Amino acid sequence: MVRWLTAGESHGPALVATVEGLPAGIRVSSTDIGAELARRRLGHGRGARMKFEQDEIELLGGLRHGVSLGGPVSVVVRNTEWPKWERVMAPDPIDPAELEGLGRNAPLTRPRPGHADLAGMQKYGFDDARPVLERASARETAARVALGTVARALLRQAYGIEVVSHVVAIGAVEVPPGTPPPTSLAVVDADPVRCADPASSALMVAEIDAAHRDADTLGGIVEVLAYGCPPGLGSYVHGDRRLDARLAGELMGIQAIKGVEFGDGFRTARRRGSVAHDEIEPLEGPGRRVRRASDRAGGVEGGMTTGEPLRVRAAMKPISSLSKPLATIDVATGDPAVAIAQRSDVCAVPAAGVVAEAMVALVLAGAALEKFGGDSVEETRRNYEGYLKSLAVR
């Protein structure tokens, strides 16, 4: 069973992440993790923090000489701004006199609409939004991307699975239906908004610039594809074992994600059954080999992969920290007020795709290991290859 946890606050000393249940023999390094974290900072419309934020990575356990040992893998992502926050966010008790006059320590009593601020204050009994926003911040996704790098390495090395994401909508701009999905991360990452369609990309950039001029924010939709998944990952036996249910849960757990769909998703609900499903056809060659004539289901049927590319989309709402804050109340007085203004992005949809890749990789790694087992990459690859050879219909 693959499990993971993260700890840490946005302006704390570091984020800490641990994943367990992965086999020995995965080749991965801090350089690989650093490259993925750099991808997370990509995208036109990111805020000032992305310009000076550098992720300092330290591998604490689970690897030796760039190869996993089979135990838990732990990663620390240090906060390079910690010296500015070490008194305000000190984990240990601190003399109140040291906090006097520090602007960063001022209570945040005007919760932002759309953010975790107010509900978190109510739930945990805080009179200040600082403890809520520090953990609720999307900064936490850096830890998940770090762990996703390890899972991605396993998928590539043991099963030949590649995970790719791209932006299909920002604001009112959408990629035209039928646009071929990308197969190369390098091509997508070279685009300013990580969009595979150049014409749509230019319109998205213009949309972001217009929102910036209006002191506003934008959401959008990312699509994640996993190429090379064999049939049979996941299960129809129980709801919580269905692969699409597990993927949807982890994607919805990403900050600001408000919806998930597989394949043609909600469009399928508006079609008749005769044009909603993927017909099955034989392939030429030895053995009984088949394929789907289309991929409307997104590579998942009955909670299991079909062997076609896995295709899942996640919808991200506009960022709730605005330069022109919305109406709220001051919880200290109960009076009407405007929400607190925090440094933020205009649009973080391109980065959301990178985070979504990480979560898809972690879920697929867990599903593959449940199916094929193995305490080492070599063993699980051998089991995987044996499974493919034994399929009655491939």
UniProtKB/Swiss-Prot annotation:
Q: MF terms per GO, please?
A: chorismate synthase activity; FMN binding
What reaction does this enzyme carry out catalytically? Answer: 5-O-(1-carboxyvinyl)-3-phosphoshikimate = chorismate + phosphate
Identify the cofactor(s): FMNH2
- Pfam families recorded: Chorismate_synt
Give the cofactor note. Reduced FMN (FMNH(2)).
Q: Which family does it belong to?
A: Belongs to the chorismate synthase family.
- Could you tell me the Gene Ontology terms of the biological process aspect for this record? amino acid biosynthetic process; aromatic amino acid family biosynthetic process; chorismate biosynthetic process
Task: Work out whether the entry's keyword set contains Lyase.
Answer: yes
Q: Which residues bind FMN?
A: R135, A136, S137, Q255, A256, G302, K317, P318, I319, S320, S321, R343
State the organism's lineage.
Answer: Bacteria, Bacillati, Actinomycetota, Actinomycetes, Frankiales
NCBIfam families listed in its UniProt record: aroC, PRK05382.1
Top-level EC class: lyase
UniProt subunit comment: Homotetramer.
Q: Which CDD domains match?
A: Chorismate_synthase
The molecule here is called Chorismate synthase
Q: Which gene holds the coding sequence for this protein?
A: aroC
What this chain does, per the record?
This reaction introduces a second double bond into the aromatic ring system.
- Residues that coordinate or bind NADP(+): R40, R46
Pathway given for this chain reads: Metabolic intermediate biosynthesis; chorismate biosynthesis; chorismate from D-erythrose 4-phosphate and phosphoenolpyruvate: step 7/7
Q: What EC numbers are recorded for this enzyme?
A: 4.2.3.5
